[in-house]
C-alpha cells in the first residue's frame, strides 16, 4: 500500500475528485483513503490503540474528531469516518511526505493503481498501461519519474 498507488493532496477537493471520477472512473461516493503519519492522524481522527496495526493497511475506519476540519476533507465518508492509512517511518510514502512538507501537504489521498474494474497493477508494465489509458500525466517508479509524453512517444 503506497507502492502501487494513485496519490494526490488529500485535502485538495478538486484533486481528489479528479482522481476518483476522471482517473479511476468510479462513483463519487467511494472516497479514497487518507494516508498520513501517526502524529497527523491523531490530530484529526479518534484512533483506537487496540487496532493500530489495522491503520497501516487501511483495514479499519475511524471517526473524525468532532469539530476537526477533517470532517470536511474529501477523503471523509458521509458518516464522518475515514479508512485511514498511517504510513510507517522510512517508507516510501513517509519519504514522499517529507518532500511535500514545504508545500504544506501532510495528507495524501491514496487509491490503488488501477482503473475501475481492473485488477491492481502488478508491475511497471501494468503501471505504464494505466498511465497510457488514463489522463495521468506522470508515473513515479523505481526507475524515476516518468512523464506520459515520454511514455507514449
Summary of predicted features, one role per range:
Residues 1-153:
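Flexible beta->alpha loop and helix N-cap segments adjacent to enzyme active/binding sites
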Amino acid at each position: 500500500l503506497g507502492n502501487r498507488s494513485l496519490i494526490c493532496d488529500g485535502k485538495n477537493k478538486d484533486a481528489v475528485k479528479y482522481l476518483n471520477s476522471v482517473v479511476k472512473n468510479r462513483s463519487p461516493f467511494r472516497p479514497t483513503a487518507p494516508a498520513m503519519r501517526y502524529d497527523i492522524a491523531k490530530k484529526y481522527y479518534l484512533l483506537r490503540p487496540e487496532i493500530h496495526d489495522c491503520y497501516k493497511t487501511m483495514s479499519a475506519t475511524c471517526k473524525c474528531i468532532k469539530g476537526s476540519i477533517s470532517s470536511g476533507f474529501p477523503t471523509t465518508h458521509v458518516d464522518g469516518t475515514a479508512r485511514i492509512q498511517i504510513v510507517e517511518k522510512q517508507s516510501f510514502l513517509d519519504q514522499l511526505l517529507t518532500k511535500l512538507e514545504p508545500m504544506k501537504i501532510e495528507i495524501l489521498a491514496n487509491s490503488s493503481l488501477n482503473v475501475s474494474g481492473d485488477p491492481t497493477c502488478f508491475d511497471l508494465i501494468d503501471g505504464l498501461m494505466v498511465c497510457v489509458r488514463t489522463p495521468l500525466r506522470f508515473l513515479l517508479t523505481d526507475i524515476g519519474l516518468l512523464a506520459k509524453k515520454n511514455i507514449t512517444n
